[in-house]
Amino acid sequence: MLNPVVTVSIFQKQPDPKVFSAGQVIFEEGQSGDEMYGIIQGEVNILVNGKIVETIETGEIFGAGVLVGVKSRTYAAIAKVDTKLGFLDEQGFLFAVQETPVFALQVMKSYSERLSRLQRMV
């Protein structure tokens, strides 16, 4: 079974990952978005109201909410270290879900686990 980041990398339209330097903003809380990400290499801080609530690492995915109906980003994402990200837009996401249904389950699991962790912090 493919890990979700490998799936993202396979189905992204552009062959090259997005590269972010340590401290660089990937997206802001409240910003609209049209891509989800998978960490190929590096670490990303997840912030809510300017506070780091989680650090995610190589092999994890994030940002899928905007592809499944959430209108704007519910958190900010900032590269903690130099980071390479695979990414999918909505069309690529839907194709990946259709071609590899396990990917959809992995995305739902990641999304629900992150939501549960964030709710426990409130």
Model-assigned labels for residue ranges:
Residues 1-122:
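Cytosolic regulatory regions built on CNB/CRP/Popeye-like sensor folds
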